A protein has these predicted regions:
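Feature captures the catalytic ectodomains and active-site-proximal regions of enzymes
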Residues: 1-278
């Protein structure tokens, strides 16, 4: 990895992102060497202080590692910039994920069918841009909600999917085990969401869920295992959607709503979820 990137790394171990800054942040400031680490997820993470390694240089290091990560089937290479001094380091909102390009997804089928697919927040990073007509990165829940407000106020000339990720719950409050901050963020989102809900018409399908848990009251700093919420506003509501067998059910529901085939090409059985609309 050092040969590919042309730099020497610190770390090269499995650690929590916050812990490794405590352990190696001061040495990074002294040597200028980026910190390389991994975690329980399928990731390579590169941390660097923004005053030591400029953002574009950090991103370029991650781009170079993406080829190696593809070969080893590693899901993401994550740039983890931070600021601050020893004892008070803080990760910034300039994180950037370089993900493995996924196989065909419902997003690709929507785009091919003429549906405008817009990713807000980390969605462009997660899907490596695949199947997205437009990617709108954001740095906070507030910016994500403001972007949604702007998009919902528009009158598009074709069907549109808005796919938004609100990162603060996970990044700022889950991993950092800040239950008070998590609660405030939930209240803020609930206020925003509640005021927008009456404005959604019968031609709009709304789905809210999460890709994993991150209990801010649990020990450690990693993701936690619990059932995630699944809320829908659309035809046949209200009713209990029950506990689903697969995230693919969300994709199947979106595919049915837009009138496309969710099954994909031959052999992609992973797309064959069960629509909530059925």
């Amino acid at each position: 990895m050092e040969a590919i990137c042309g730099v020497s790394f610190l770390g090269n171990c499995a650690r929590s992102g916050t812990v490794i800054l405590e352990e190696l942040g001061a040495e990074h400031l002294r040597t200028g060497k980026p910190i390389l680490y991994t975690s329980a997820d399928s990731v390579i993470q590169i941390a660097a202080h923004e005053s030591i390694v400029p953002l574009e240089q950090l991103y370029e290091i991650c781009r170079r590692l993406r080829g190696l990560a593809d070969r080893e089937r590693i899901g993401r290479v994550i740039a983890r910039p931070f600021l601050g001094e020893p004892g008070a380091f803080r990760r910034t909102a300039n994180r950037h994920d370089f993900a493995m390009r996924p196989p065909e997804t419902v997003l690709n089928r929507l785009e091919a069918a003429g549906v405008e697919t817009i990713g807000v927040g980390k969605i462009g990073d997660i899907f490596s841009g695949s199947g997205l007509s437009q990617s709108l990165p954001t740095k906070s829940n507030a910016e994500g909600c403001a972007t949604m407000d702007r998009l919902l106020a528009e009158n598009p000339d074709r069907p549109r999917l808005l796919f938004t990720n609100l990162v603060d719950f996970d990044m700022l409050y889950g991993h950092r085990r800040d239950p008070a901050g998590y609660a405030r963020a939930l209240v803020e989102f609930d206020d925003w969401f509640g005021s927008r809900l009456p404005g959604l018409d019968s031609e709009t399908l709304l789905l809210i869920t999460a890709d994993h848990g991150n209990d801010p009251t649990w020990r450690g700093t990693d993701h936690t295992r619990e059932q995630v919420p699944l809320l829908m506003k659309g035809p046949g509501m209200p009713r209990n959607l029950g506990a689903r067998e697969s995230f693919a059910d969300v994709a199947a529901t979106v595919a049915e709503w837009f009138g496309i085939d969710s099954r994909g090409a031959a052999g992609l059985a992973g797309l064959a979820g069960k629509s909530f609309l059925a």
